[in-house]
Structures are given as structure tokens and as C-alpha cells.
UniProtKB/Swiss-Prot annotation:
Family in the record: Belongs to the RbfA family.
Intracellular or extracellular location(s): Cytoplasm
Superkingdom to which the source organism belongs: Bacteria
Organism, as annotated: Buchnera aphidicola subsp. Acyrthosiphon pisum (strain Tuc7)
GO molecular function per UniProt: ribosomal small subunit binding
Cytoplasm found in the keyword field: yes
GO BP of this protein: maturation of SSU-rRNA
Lineage, highest ranks first: Bacteria, Pseudomonadati, Pseudomonadota, Gammaproteobacteria, Enterobacterales
Job description of the protein: One of several proteins that assist in the late maturation steps of the functional core of the 30S ribosomal subunit. Associates with free 30S ribosomal subunits (but not with 30S subunits that are part of 70S ribosomes or polysomes). Required for efficient processing of 16S rRNA. May interact with the 5'-terminal helix region of 16S rRNA.
UniProt protein name: Ribosome-binding factor A
InterPro entries xrefs: KH_dom-like_a/b (IPR015946), RbfA (IPR000238), RbfA_dom_sf (IPR023799), Ribosome-bd_factorA_CS (IPR020053)
Main location: cytoplasm
């Protein structure tokens, strides 16, 4: 019987939970104090890198979003250190944060469709 998930998918799911908890509870930087959602985690096959896609509650200003992503990338070594303590992995992947704007795009499309149905 074929496995439903491979190891990198299971690790990506666990990383998503742990990183969301770390960002919410352990990061004390006041410049990042907003609601951050970890929407997706992609782990490389050799588990050396993890791309973390995050979205922000107040993501209207593009400059603020870029600044917050930069701050998260600077804090990635600290987050990785906390992950080493919380996960029992031989190799904890290097973390790279990216902005996920799919929610904003989806919201924009639904507003356009709603306006079309009203006409």
C-alpha cells in the first residue's frame, strides 16, 4: 500500500505548527507585532531548506510587508534555534520567509465577481 504522505510533507506540516507557535509566542520584536498566519511550508527533498509563506492581517502597505518579511528573515536563525529544541530532527532546515498574498488576490477576485453579479 502506498504512503499517503512522504517524510518531507509530514515535516512541513509539523514545521508549520511549530513556526506559527514560535512567531506568536516567542518573538518579542515590537515591529512584528501583528497577526501573522503561516499559510504554507515547502521543504526541500533533502530537508536543508524550508520556504515559509506567511500572510499578515494588515497587509495593505507593500513597504510594511517587505519590512516585516525582512525582519522575519533576520530572526530566522533564532526561530531555527527554537525549532531545534522543539523538534527531534537530525537536520533542522534553514528558514526563508516569503509573503503569501493569495488571500488578498482571492478577496479581490471575489469582490469583482460580487460587483459583476450586482450589475
Amino acid at each position: 500500500m502506498e504512503k499517503l504522505f512522504n517524510r518531507s510533507d509530514r515535516i512541513a506540516q509539523e514545521l508549520q505548527k511549530k513556526i506559527a507557535a514560535i512567531i506568536q509566542h516567542s518573538l518579542k520584536d515590537p515591529r512584528i507585532k501583528t497577526i501573522i498566519t503561516v499559510s504554507e511550508v515547502q521543504v526541500s527533498k533533502d530537508l536543508s531548506y524550508a520556504q515559509i509563506f506567511v500572510s499578515f492581517l494588515e497587509s495593505d502597505n507593500n513597504e510594511k510587508v517587505k519590512k516585516k518579511i525582512t525582519l522575519l528573515n533576520r530572526a530566522s536563525s533564532y526561530i531555527r534555534k527554537l525549532l531545534c529544541k522543539r523538534m527531534k530532527l537530525r537536520i533542522v532546515p534553514n528558514i526563508i520567509f516569503h509573503h503569501d498574498d493569495s488571500f488578498l488576490k482571492g478577496n479581490k477576485i471575489s469582490c469583482i465577481l460580487e460587483n459583476l453579479t450586482k450589475k
